Design a protein with these regions (language model features):
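Membrane-embedded, hydrophobic transmembrane alpha-helices
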Residues: 1-77, 194
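Membrane-interface alpha helices of multi-pass inner-membrane proteins
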Residues: 35-40, 234-239, 244-270
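Perimembrane helix-loop-helix junctions
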Residues: 264-294
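Active-site lumenal/periplasmic loops and adjacent helix-entry segments of GT-C-fold
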Residues: 97-231
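Transmembrane alpha-helical segments
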Residues: 59-61, 168-179, 229-241, 267-274, ...
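Transmembrane helical bundles and short interhelical boundary loops of multi-pass, membrane-embedded
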Residues: 30, 38-43, 297-493
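Transmembrane signal-anchor helices characteristic of membrane glycosylation enzymes that use polyprenol
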Residues: 35-45, 56-63, 80-108, 168-173, ...
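Membrane-interfacial loop-to-transmembrane alpha-helix junctions, especially the N-terminal start
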Residues: 18-30, 75-85, 184-186, 244-247, ...
């Protein structure tokens, strides 16, 4: 299930530099940008989409010849071997058990996820509601599956969502293997288990509304549509193998999948770009690369699109933090304990320091009300980079592994995910349901067991049916917008 990868020089300090990852780079680029191109083709006017697509192609392709000699001297990094199929199968199972595909009982957030896919399959693109408003939502994750659904039906689209998400997770795992210098099944497990030490935080009675950095399994269950693309981009970024001229374009694509994640990850993207720009042979030429204007134009189009949403103005600003003892415990158990393992190897890595600074400063800012959306979504980039550093530390230092696994066991967030997995089947959920006469268990083990196995709210979330048009629902303004004249100039509304 695991194996060390060959290196051109024994004892090389950077094992991630030891292999040719051309195929992995282009697979990652295609996974991130294909939905963007679909969106441009069906949502934008041709006089905007065609020049922009051409500029993007030039930005991605230029500079490729200079990298060929270095690539040819390295052993290839195959996408598939026997362990790869096991990992891909495990990620497919994770997507299904997390509710994607609608085959099992789901978390309540899937009321919107299910309706979005059905709307995209059933409606012409761009989606215009009967009252003239338009769908404004980060639909990128569903566009390729929905395109398949328009040809072959909703059932195919649902299956494609699972496969599309599993492929994104698979690519992220491969980048962890590249960065750590070790292709290991256990790195896939580490990736899924990574997150805040939620069990420990709950036992201490900490206020999770003040700081809750969602783990990988939580992100996949609730918002794989936004989190998987962002995780993939920032793990790729942390590996140091992303071509500098790709960074602006692929970062602009993350704004399509999650604007708040792009905001939270902006310092990390800038830091890594500067780090690689300083090390390039032609730094001045990099500043005038065509990928920059392409990224600016693409980002501006996404910004105008999301700005047209009908949602009430978001409450945003800053708030005091680290004013209570529990705040320090939250920061420590959310990510600082993981960072301690990585400090020895990466304390001189500017991206690692920037990751720590971003994770420490994010709690001072908020967007929206009691649930801080900036922490929920804007923390994904920092956590993805920290995951990459932790995976590399895990591979380099076998003596630390038992301690890392112990932390991950506390960070698996079983209170959140595992009950849904246990209640994925209605029959199993009925079996686990406590009787009406059963009082709240008094012992700690019994309470923990119930938290671990039973989610009464798990069911097929189909209240919205086949459409996102529900004007009376309090969530509807967040997914609809009134097209303005300037928006109609860019988009085919």
């Amino acid at each position: 299930g695991s194996g060390k990868m060959s290196s051109p020089a024994a004892g090389a300090p950077f094992p991630e530099r030891a292999f040719n990852v051309t195929a992995l780079k282009w697979n990652t680029c295609a996974w991130l940008l294909l939905p963007v191109l679909v969106f441009m083709a069906w949502w934008m006017h041709w006089y905007v989409s065609i020049p922009l697509a051409a500029l993007m192609a030039v930005g991605l392709a230029s500079g490729r010849r200079k990298e060929l000699p270095e690539r040819e001297s390295l052993p290839s990094f195959p996408l598939f071997n026997r362990s790869s199929f096991l990992v891909l199968g495990a990620f497919i199972a994770l997507m299904v058990l997390s509710g994607w595909g609608e085959w099992v009982n789901q978390h309540p957030d899937h009321i919107v996820r299910n309706a979005c896919l059905r709307e995209l399959v059933a409606s012409p693109w761009p989606v215009v509601f009967p009252d003239g408003d338009v769908l404004i939502y980060n639909t990128g994750f569903w566009l390729v599956p929905a395109l398949a659904g328009k040809v072959a039906g909703l059932g195919v689209a649902r299956a494609f969502v699972v496969l599309w998400g599993a492929w994104g997770l698979f690519l992220a795992w491969l980048w962890l293997c590249v960065f750590s210098g070790r292709r290991s099944l256990l790195l896939a497990l580490l990736m899924v288990m990574f997150g805040s030490l939620l069990n420990f935080q709950c036992w201490l009675g900490l206020d999770l509304f003040r700081l809750h950095y969602f783990g990988t399994a939580e992100q996949v269950m609730c918002s794989a549509n936004a989190s998987i693309p962002v995780m993939l981009f920032f793990i790729f970024l942390a590996s140091g193998r992303m071509p500098p001229h790709w960074m602006p374009l692929l970062f602009a694509a993350t704004a399509f999948y999650s604007p708040l994640a792009a905001l939270g990850g902006l310092p990390l993207a800038v830091c890594q770009w500067l780090r690689q720009w300083k090390g390039s042979r032609t730094p001045r030429r990099s500043l005038f690369h065509p990928s920059f204007p392409a990224a600016v134009m693409l980002g501006a189009c996404f910004l105008l699109y999301y700005a047209a949403v009908n949602a009430p103005s978001s409450h945003m600003g800053w708030r005091p933090f680290y004013t209570r003892p529990g705040d320090f415990l939250l920061a420590g158990t959310s990510f600082l304990l993981y960072a301690l393992f990585c400090w020895r190897d990466f304390r001189r890595n500017s991206l690692f320091i920037c990751t720590l600074a971003t994770g420490l400063l994010l709690p001072f800012f908020y967007v929206n009300g009691d649930v801080n959306d900036l922490l929920c979504k804007g923390s994904v980039p920092a956590m993805a980079c920290l995951l990459a550093f932790l995976a590399s530390t895990w591979a380099r230092h076998p003596r630390l592994r038992i301690w890392i696994w112990l932390l991950l066991a506390l960070g698996l967030a079983p209170r959140f995910n595992v009950p849904y997995y246990c209640c994925s089947s209605s029959a199993l959920q009925e079996f686990l349901t406590p009787s009406a006469s059963c009082a709240e268990p008094s012992s700690f083990p019994c309470r923990e067991w119930r938290q671990l196995t039973y989610a009464p709210q798990a069911r097929h979330q189909d209240e919205w049916g086949r459409t996102m048009h529900h004007p009376g629902h309090r969530w509807h303004p967040y997914y609809s917008g009134t097209p303005r004249p300037w928006l109609r100039f860019i988009y085919r509304f």
